[in-house]
Amino acid sequence: MTVHATPEPAAHQGVALGSSFYAAMRILPRPQREAMFQVYSFCRFVDDIADSDRPREQRVAELQQWRDDIAALYRGAPPPRLADYQESLRTFGLKREDFEAIIDGMEMDVDADIRAPDEATLDLYCDRVASAVGRLSVRIFGLPEADGIELSHHLGRALQLTNILRDIDEDAGIGRLYLPSELLHKVGITATDPRVVAADSALPSVCAPLVERALAHFAAADKVMNRNPRRVVKAPRIMGKYYYSILQLLIARGFAAPRAPVKLGKASKIAILLQYAIV
């Protein structure tokens, strides 16, 4: 996508169609559904920029164009690709800083390939690329302010840590390593080459505390959802259960190399959807 590429407003649902969260978004009432498709579409476009193999300078420019477009949107003069976001901003009170935080997270991937970040940097990354998405989403779902912030904090981190644990080999293939340096050093891994780390026999000992951390975030997110009306949290509940199930598959598989890819099957997704979609 070039800097000036303009997705048509009607294409938001099509962009979201490939998401594992599509069904969770599709069951929402129309205004919420359309707003979630918009948020997902935005995330997908900036994420594709961050993950592309185009020169870094070009990707930086493309992300800056999105930042400029978000600024224009909040000035009331959106570019064509964000024109239909205005109604969602007014209806749900979506915050500019959350869109910008997502771009900040993508820039962390573009500025340099992330390799063994310290814990603080990893947590900041998770907040930007996952919890910021959650902060936009919980406003659309209709959660109270405090509970929404708490849910996005915990569920966002749970999902992103699960992503990191699932994608160790895929990330290594593009020169990235999101496992924190403190945990690597604790088990004697000093290499920062992602492929070398991915093949290290001590890797399961690095992953174990991240698994526990993700499980704790899932549990904290469940507590927030349990105290809110079922109709308000059905979409995040489905999203969380999808990823909790993936984490359980990862635990069952283990983290020693070689690792077989893990994917949640269609039947499991349907079962989760049927369990939580009907209020």
Swiss-Prot record:
Q: Which UniProt keywords apply?
A: Transferase
Top-level division of the source organism's lineage: Bacteria
Using the UniProt record, name the top-level EC class of this enzyme in a single word: transferase
Q: Could you confirm whether the keyword Zinc appears in this record?
A: no
Name the InterPro entries for this protein: Isoprenoid_synthase_dom_sf, SQ_synth_HpnD-like, Squ/phyt_synthse, Squalene/phytoene_synthase_CS, Trans_IPPS_bact-type, Trans_IPPS_HH
List the EC numbers from the record: 2.5.1.103
Q: Which family does it belong to?
A: Belongs to the phytoene/squalene synthase family. HpnD subfamily.
The Gene Ontology biological process terms listed for this entry are: carotenoid biosynthetic process
The name this protein carries in UniProt is Presqualene diphosphate synthase
**Pathway linked to the protein:** Secondary metabolite biosynthesis; hopanoid biosynthesis
Catalytic function, reaction form: 2 (2E,6E)-farnesyl diphosphate = presqualene diphosphate + diphosphate
Q: Which SUPFAM superfamilies match?
A: Terpenoid synthases (SSF48576)
Supply the Pfam families for this chain: SQS_PSY
GO MF assignments: geranylgeranyl diphosphate synthase activity; squalene synthase [NAD(P)H] activity
Q: Does the keyword Coiled coil apply?
A: no
Q: What does this protein do?
A: Involved in the biosynthesis of the hopanoid precursor squalene (SQ) from farnesyl diphosphate (FPP). Catalyzes the first step, the formation of presqualene diphosphate (PSPP) from two molecules of FPP.
Q: Which organism is it from?
A: Rhodopseudomonas palustris (strain ATCC BAA-98 / CGA009)
- Quote the Gene3D superfamilies the UniProt record gives: Farnesyl Diphosphate Synthase (1.10.600.10)
